[in-house]
Swiss-Prot record:
One cellular component (GO) term of this entry: plasma membrane
UniProt key word Cell inner membrane: yes
HAMAP family per record: KdgT
Organism: Salmonella typhimurium (strain LT2 / SGSC1412 / ATCC 700720)
Family of the protein in this entry: Belongs to the KdgT transporter family.
Principal localisation: membrane
Keywords assigned: Cell inner membrane, Cell membrane, Membrane, Sugar transport, Symport, Transmembrane, Transmembrane helix, Transport
Ranges annotated as spanning the membrane: 10-30, 47-67, 82-102, 106-126, 134-154, 159-179, 195-215, 217-237, 248-268, 279-299
Protein name as annotated: 2-keto-3-deoxygluconate permease 1
Keyword Transport: yes
One annotated GO molecular function: 2-keto-3-deoxygluconate:proton symporter activity
Membrane topology: Multi-pass membrane protein
Compartments reported by the entry: Cell inner membrane
Length: 317
């Protein structure tokens, strides 16, 4: 029985399959993951420490020379996501009012499209990308929260730049970079461990998803996810390539962060007049989180295969 080969037939399978299994268990038998001990620590609450270990391992593969390019890619993709989200969201708000179109409000669009799932990004660039793509997460982590969304809605005065959150993401990467650049043997040792961690933190991420939210969000929520991955992804990929990337990082960032579901609450607290719209946006964003967790690996895998074919043709030309 070749389980590994079967999983790898699915685009981004080492990320997607464990994530879906975790979500299914959390939806239908959540108590199975809450028995305590090592089981709960690993399968339910393990995402953050496992991603931290993953970033350290992958950071070991980043050379000091590659760091500026990684920062450029991360900054460009982050800015592109923000501008595209603002453009589409405020366009819908202007043309169709606060209620939006097809059930999609400007608040929901901006909150979903201006965020990205850091864990999903890390897994995908770890599998398909290069050291610069991995390093870009240090900047991309800035869009993992309500800050940019609130800027877009004119409520920037109610938010602060999460500097310590950025530092917290950087520390494992920097520790890995230091070890990898000081000792080539440590680089080889650590970088081999990165891919091993992907299915474990993918399962833990899935264990935080309840598939009932997909039903609550309905077709509008699924449409929001499609918009985030494919329309937003088109611009992210172009922006990534514009600054010398392969497009893989841009594709991998075309998702909605899990904590984006809490963004409408932050918006409602900043502007109580948006409370009703914000409440309606939450299930839509939750549906987008689930939809993009499935679609973004498909897009990233397609971009990676296309890039590999082009590289092969150029090599043989």
């Amino acid at each position: 029985m070749n389980i590994k080969k079967a999983i790898e037939r699915v685009p981004g399978g080492m990320m997607v399959v464990p994530l879906v299994i975790g979500a299914v268990i959390n939806t239908f038998a959540p108590q199975a993951l809450e028995i305590g001990g090592f089981t709960t620590a690993l399968f339910k609450n393990g995402a953050a420490p496992l991603i931290g270990a993953f970033l350290l391992c992958m950071g070991a593969g980043i050379s000091v020379k590659a760091a500026p390019q990684a920062l450029l890619q991360g900054g460009t993709i982050t800015l592109t996501k923000l501008l595209v989200a603002i453009g589409i969201g405020l366009g819908v708000e202007h043309l169709f009012g606060a209620e939006g179109i097809f059930g999609l409000s400007g608040v929901a669009i901006i909150a979903a499209m201006s965020n990205s799932n850091g864990g999903l990004y890390a897994a995908l660039v770890g599998e398909f990308g290069n050291e610069r793509d991995v390093g870009a997460i240090s900047i991309l982590s800035l869009n993992d929260g309500p800050f940019f969304t609130m800027i877009a809605l004119g409520a920037a005065g109610m938010a602060n730049i999460p500097i310590m959150a950025l530092v917290a993401v950087l520390v494992p990467l920097v520790v890995g970079m230091i070890l990898g650049n000081l000792d080539p043997h440590m680089r080889d040792f650590l970088t081999k461990g990165g891919p091993l961690l992907i299915p474990f933190f993918a399962f833990a991420l899935g264990a935080g998803i309840n598939l009932e939210m997909l039903l609550q969000g309905g077709l509008a929520g699924i449409l929001l996810g499609v918009l985030t991955t494919f329309v937003g992804g088109f611009f992210n990929i172009r922006a990534d390539r514009l600054v010398g990337g392969t497009g893989i990082a841009g594709a991998a960032a075309s998702s909605t962060a899990g904590n984006a579901v809490a963004t409408p609450l932050a918006i409602a607290q900043a502007d109580p007049s948006l409370a009703e719209v914000a409440a309606a946006a939450a299930p839509l964003i939750a549906a987008s989180v689930i939809t993009t967790a499935i679609l973004t690996p498909v897009l990233t895998s397609w971009v990676a295969k296309k890039q590999a074919r082009q590289a092969s043709l150029e090599k043989n030309a």
